[in-house]
């Protein structure tokens, strides 16, 4: 069993993955486990510390989530965050109750006592709160380490036991010294060393792949995006002669995508590629389907069917490799107590019964780590820094039913958006950019004539890992040129809007 420096127990926060990511940025390997993991499994990981995540439940409710109480008797440092903080207080007989004043957003805290958590940090800090419960009294044996205007027990701890509790979320970017607090917990409380990196990850994953696969063969599904390209490169580095790389044209690709993917794998990466045109079957099954969850599940099921049919043509194929990431896992909620945001076609969208076993070597890392891994494996920056493109493709960028006319319309406007962003230098400055066909018509005037045509939405966001995102502040002249070109060059569009929503509350993709 793989060891972990720090274990993060997931109580349902959508930001649980960020805790692990922030620690990994410091070179500390952190792993996430369900909140109800057994004490034996925790001991087997030989952690140097434990973090209890936030979550949507209340410790005083009948449906509260509780970890094994023996965690507090292991002699390990423990850090409780939000719900984890309230859980620690509850365990040590303090009272947790609904807060009269709920806190959501930025708050200012003031450090009241020196602590390992706040080593070399300023006394006053801005942090991110997100809670509706409060700790009403200090647990026995603990002392206040920091306060805020609405939280007199904002941070408390027991330095002897190295138990610490935070009401705020240090893992989100809005907590200005949150990264430092997590680093201090790992370094000064847990005595962790900064030795984890993508080089060591690549080596470990290659060994795991060889051990799991043995002499069998692996079907590797690729889309041309960075995730599947890195998976293919990782498999090739581990078991090159046993990998069959397959690209499926599902009819939901961007303009020129099929040709780009085929060229990249054969000419740039030097990997043999089997290309399958399955557009008819995908589009026929999506006909008259409007619900986004149904779209994702249909696409997921159909992908598996196509891959399983291809596998029958080759001997000893027992595995299917996919580029599932941590962000896919958390949004599809198959870790801990997290609530489902949406199913991903390669997580919640998969059929229950598959003839192929899944290999997902990237499911424990984030997008930025995938890119670092890609560079480590020798992929070009052009491949590694392509904008993310979802597995369900343009199907989840068309509101409502997916059909060929809508796909062609969306492809045309998408080409214009990307051309303008690349020509102005904004493509490389942003995380992701795409258009959404709203399937909503509006009145317009072109020349002397009335029009009643489609509206299209532009979505461009900045992010570091995809877990949170803000809309990109594109210059007005860039937006104006994009809008002008789309309306003038694409028949059937008379209105362009810009999505200025952040994640949360919105997701990056519309469906």
UniProtKB/Swiss-Prot annotation:
Where along the chain is the active site annotated?
82 (nucleophile), 169, 171
- Recorded E.C. number(s)? 6.3.5.2
Give me the residues that bind ATP, please.
223-229
Organism of this sequence: Campylobacter jejuni subsp. jejuni serotype O:23/36 (strain 81-176)
Spell out the PANTHER family in the cross-references.
GMP SYNTHASE [GLUTAMINE-HYDROLYZING], GMP SYNTHASE-RELATED
Q: Which reactions does this protein catalyse?
A: XMP + L-glutamine + ATP + H2O = GMP + L-glutamate + AMP + diphosphate + 2 H(+)
**Any one Gene Ontology molecular-function term assigned to this protein's record:** ATP binding
- Which enzyme class? ligase
Described by its record, this protein's role is as follows: Catalyzes the synthesis of GMP from XMP.
Pathway stated in the Swiss-Prot or TrEMBL entry: Purine metabolism; GMP biosynthesis; GMP from XMP (L-Gln route): step 1/1
Q: What is this protein called?
A: GMP synthase [glutamine-hydrolyzing]
Please name the SUPFAM superfamilies in this protein's record: Adenine nucleotide alpha hydrolases-like, Class I glutamine amidotransferase-like, GMP synthetase C-terminal dimerisation domain
Any stretches that span the bilayer, and where are they? Answer: none
Q: Which domain of life is it from?
A: Bacteria
Q: Which CDD domains did the record assign? A: GATase1_GMP_Synthase, GMP_synthase_C
Q: Which GO terms describe its cellular component?
A: cytosol
Q: Which residues form the GMPS ATP-PPase domain?
A: 196-386
Q: Where is the Glutamine amidotransferase type-1 domain?
A: 5-195
Gene coding for it = guaA
Entry keyword annotation includes Cytoplasm: no
Keyword terms: ATP-binding, Glutamine amidotransferase, GMP biosynthesis, Ligase, Nucleotide-binding, Purine biosynthesis
